[in-house]
């Protein structure tokens, strides 16, 4: 496992296990509404994940291999 991926997993696990004072806030329609703090954390973690994925290039390889499998299944039919 590469170092940035390992660091990100530890970071996201630490965020998810942190006790937040107001975990879930409901608005009038009883829909779940994230607090501003949780929203910032979600955006930051998504950006981190994207940068890690772009630097390692694993997702590009995964997409290419899934396309190959899909084309093979079309060809067999």
Swiss-Prot record:
It is found in: Membrane. One of its GO terms (cellular component) is membrane. The chain crosses the membrane at residues 36-52. It is a single-pass membrane protein. Keywords: Membrane, Transmembrane, Transmembrane helix. This is Putative uncharacterized YKL165C-A. The lineage of its organism: Eukaryota, Fungi, Dikarya, Ascomycota, Saccharomycotina.
């Amino acid at each position: 496992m590469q170092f940035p991926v390992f660091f990100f997993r530890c970071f996201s696990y630490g965020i998810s296990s942190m006790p937040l004072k107001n975990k879930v806030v409901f608005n009038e329609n009883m829909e779940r509404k994230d607090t501003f703090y949780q929203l910032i954390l979600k955006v930051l973690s998504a950006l981190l994940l994207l940068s890690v994925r772009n630097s390692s290039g694993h997702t590009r390889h995964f997409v290419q291999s899934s396309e190959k499998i899909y084309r093979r299944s079309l060809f067999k039919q």
